């Protein structure tokens, strides 16, 4: 062995600079390449024939309320700049985040929501004011769905990856899952929608045609391992709250009836959020041609042109889908409300009903989120206000969502107790700025927080029982009594849920969250 080693050394020296060092009998070395099986860069490589992937081919159109279907490239977008931006993003844009959207700065400045370094990317911490807004939105959409006849349920957040029906579904979305190990080596995935639990519940139900339509609703905490480069602020998250409703329908006719009802509820939600969005409708070609008049009627309800995507054949589980989308401050779009007609999953999950003839049949299934993700709704509100601010306007919250609806500013400490008594008479989320700051500074701070009603309180207000509020909305009442102020507040709050302020009433008692 030594002779062979020397010969190798001599041969190598002809072309290379070689050094040979003594190595004792009791020494050894080992080369190894180690990687944790769960490490992001680890791979299991299998030799198998590459499967041919079917390319999804679609065509883009603009459909007007008058029923004209025009190729998107030939449509005159004059007066519809928002629709143009949305089309260009959908057809040619990238979801990768290149510039930080404006809502991120606002959500931090207003102490609403923030990143959590102790968790995975896209899992957020919600501060009291942000959580208040989030819960109010959840309560409102819950009310809308229950009033529409939905039955509220709760289903597990994790499911067996080897479940016969679920495993096929998972293969379509392999990268989106969080996996969890449990007892006896069983593996589960965290749900990325409420679909799984509601499918399995529907499968075990005994359903007659007389029971249909059946609407199942859940305010679902869901998890999706979105690509890191696409996760940004509260627009696209890995953990989010999605109000999910599934409607089991007897046939296509009933599915279209329910679709229209839920479409109109979605339009109502856009008005509630006070957002000017853009609608996308997506169809399989045959389905669109069969129901074109029905679709045009939906567009008329919206009142302006919509973007239409048409596939020659069905690539997905749905034959018709609609979304309300919003363009953000950096030229990206994101979806809020959505309704879909599903013709595949009832069969995949063996969801059946007994028809009038006594036979088991597969129903049509509607997927709907009347609001879209709640986190995204907060994002939409902030993005809308950011664009207003950029155009020189004042930012504001819808009155029912403002963390502080009325702020009392005593001119000195001697009026703090009077303000505390006054606060008991005002029917709103109210706080008192008792800090050692000037009145002008307190007014500026209240305006920075978008407080919709600001009242400075001193000797004159105490003696006369009247106030001159600063409004962040149009109001002709320049001087009001407590009674009149409550009338104004009641009118602004009509039809909306209310929660008490989640912070100490005195600003001097509040901690800073960032």
What positions do the PLM features span?
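Positively charged, low-complexity, intrinsically disordered RNA-binding extensions
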Residues: 1-47
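Conserved, charged catalytic cores of large soluble enzymes
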Residues: 271-294, 395-418, 479
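Auxiliary tRNA-acceptor-end handling modules of aminoacyl-tRNA synthetases
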Residues: 31, 44-221, 225-226, 231, ...
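Metal-assisted phosphate- and nucleotidyl-transfer catalytic regions
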Residues: 268-335, 339, 512-514
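C-terminal structured "cap/appendage" subdomains that terminate the fold
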Residues: 423-481, 485-488
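Conserved alpha/beta core surface patches that mediate binding of polyanionic ligands
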Residues: 85-109, 192-264, 318, 328-349, ...
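Generic long, charged, amphipathic alpha-helical segments
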Residues: 391-444
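Conserved short loop/turn motifs at secondary-structure junctions
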Residues: 125-132, 158-163, 279-288, 310-314, ...
